[in-house]
Amino acid sequence: MAQLYDWLVETPANAEDLESRINTRPAHLEHNKPLIEAGTLVWGGPSLAAHPKAAGEDLAIVGSVMCIRAGSEEEVREMIRNDPYAKLGQVSIRMSVK
């Protein structure tokens, strides 16, 4: 079995089209479900410009951050390319893995 590494991945959001991101979220979550169950997607969530000041306030989403367990950078990039957010143009693949 190949050696697996934990990759910290930051993906900036397309600030010009956050409505499409919100509408695509159900497909994004469904896509991630088997990755979570397999232990490939260790954790993830939105990154924010600021924390909400009050309950119910809209989140100022500027991207996502996640930990992906994989054997290579190319595997991580492929997982990101297959995500509905990436297919929508909501993330920058070139900037995704650091």
UniProtKB/Swiss-Prot annotation:
What is reported when this gene is inactivated? Does not lead to any phenotypic changes.
Pathway(s) the chain acts in: Secondary metabolite biosynthesis
Q: Where are the transmembrane segments?
A: none
The record ties this protein, via Gene3D superfamilies, to: Dimeric alpha+beta barrel (3.30.70.1060)
Q: What induces its synthesis? A: Deletion of the conserved eukaryotic csnE deneddylase subunit of the COP9 signalosome leading to defect in protein degradation results in the activation of the silenced dba gene cluster. Expression is positively regulated by the dba cluster specific transcription factor dbaA. Expression is also controlled by the transcription factor flbB.
Instruction: Check the record and name the InterPro entries matching this protein.
Output: Dimeric_a/b-barrel, Sec-metab_biosynth-assoc, YCII
**Protein function:** Part of the gene cluster that mediates the biosynthesis of the antibiotic 2,4-dihydroxy-3-methyl-6-(2-oxopropyl)benzaldehyde (DHMBA) and its derivatives. The direct non-reducing polyketide synthase dbaI product is 2,4-dihydroxy-3-methyl-6-(2-oxopropyl)benzaldehyde (DHMBA), produced by condensation of one acetyl-CoA starter unit with 4 malonyl-CoA units and one methylation step. The FAD-dependent monooxygenase dbaH is responsible for the synthesis of yellow pigments derived from the oxidation of DHMBA. The roles of dbaB, C, E and F have still to be determined.
The UniProt entry's sequence similarity note says:
Belongs to the YciI family.
Protein name from the UniProt record: Derivative of benzaldehyde biosynthesis cluster protein C
